[in-house]
């Protein structure tokens, strides 16, 4: 499923990569001003990221976080509230190694990971140390991730 999300002036198409035809259509038909966020388990992710950048799109990866209401992305272990901080950090690094040329991550919504300072802090530090952006889709207000970005 592809969701188009607008936050302020920025519009993003998220969850790209699960459906090849829809992903291709988004890259080819959406204007370059629209940022695209790809699922990290997308087959041949580096090729898709390059194609999107060639068409003028700013690219993000979706941050895989545990979602009790739905299945995890195949082959990608999500960041979890029950995992040790070092394990979540390793999972984040694995996701980061899936492609290059992206500018950051999109957190798909409120989760245990985004609500806990203890869980979010080492992840946020890793992203900040690498100069990567983080966009959180959070209709419920302020989260731990938000608080940590303003520290």
Question: Which residue ranges define each predicted feature?
Answer:
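Catalytic-site microenvironment of enzymes
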Residues: 1-151
């Amino acid at each position: 499923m592809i969701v188009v999300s607008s936050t302020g002036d920025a519009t993003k198409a998220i969850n790209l990569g699960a459906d090849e035809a829809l992903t291709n259509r988004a890259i080819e038909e959406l204007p370059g001003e629209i940022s695209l966020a790809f699922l990290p388990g997308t087959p041949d992710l580096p090729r898709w990221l390059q194609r999107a950048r060639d068409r003028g799109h700013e690219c993000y990866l979706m941050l895989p976080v545990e979602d009790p209401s739905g299945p995890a992305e195949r082959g990608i272990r999500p960041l979890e509230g029950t995992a040790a901080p070092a394990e979540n950090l390793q999972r984040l690094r694995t996701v980061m190694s899936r492609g290059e040329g992206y500018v950051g991550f999109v957190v798909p919504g409120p989760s245990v990971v985004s609500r806990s300072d203890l869980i979010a802090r080492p992840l946020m530090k890793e992203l900040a140390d690498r100069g990567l952006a983080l966009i959180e889709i959070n209709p419920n207000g302020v989260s731990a991730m938000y608080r940590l970005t303003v520290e």
